[in-house]
Amino acid sequence: MRVAQMLMVTSSALMLSGCMQQPNTTKGSSQGEGPIKIELNQLLPQESQGTAAKEGKGMVFEVGYGKNGVGCIGSTFEEGVTPLGTFKVNAIMSKDRFEMDESLIQQSGKTKNYLSENLFNNMNSIDFKGDGETGEYGSGYISLTPVPSTPQPFNFNEYDGTYRWYSFAIHGTNDETRIGKRVTGGCINMKNKQLNKLIKNINLGDEVIVTSNQPCNR
């Protein structure tokens, strides 16, 4: 961890050009090899990276983060700000996998089957920037909720007539030149190929720790 912050990420979030979500309780990493660790470099964003255990070996991956900087532990999610702290995985979505905490399924007002068949595709079909581009979440979406939980602005709702959900998350991208930059709506983005590997090796309740080499700015 680095000096200014081992900040255990708190907040479930990311919206529009970024992401978002909702809170839950804590539980140790089911990987049995420690948490996923993400360190944001505010001086050199291109050196921001994450580490995770994969089949007994270390996996290292590049990440991008919020265009408006880094939020303090325990803060409420703001557009464009990536929160620091400790989080747990409360939803995993991709073409081949759908898992979500039961409390979120109940909150959605939909059945698990409906969410499994529609939610990620709906979320990924939205043109957030109005430029005709979709697929901003890339190949998958790992939702994170802060530990301990704090109030967050994440809801299931409609955006331009499309049923969706938003939260703080790790997700893929439709433009890999955005990785290693401060460009997201608050979420952490990574290359799709690496995200696919990560999704195969995580479970609900796994721990994610987000830190920074500089103090939070919000």
What are these regions (language model features)?
Residues 34-54:
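Short polybasic amphipathic segments
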Residues 11-14:
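Repetitive helical segments and hydrophobic/amphipathic motifs
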Residues 69-74, 96-101, 178-180:
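Short, solvent-exposed loop/turn elements at domain surfaces
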Residues 55-68, 102-107:
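Short Gly/aromatic-enriched secondary-structure transition segments
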Residues 28, 32-37, 61-82, 87, ...:
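N-terminal post-signal-peptidase region of extra-cytosolic proteins
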Residues 17-18:
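C-terminal motif of bacterial Sec signal peptides marking the signal peptidase cleavage site
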Residues 1-7:
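Bacterial N-terminal signal peptides that target proteins for export
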Residues 80, 100-218:
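Exported/periplasmic cell-wall-interacting domains
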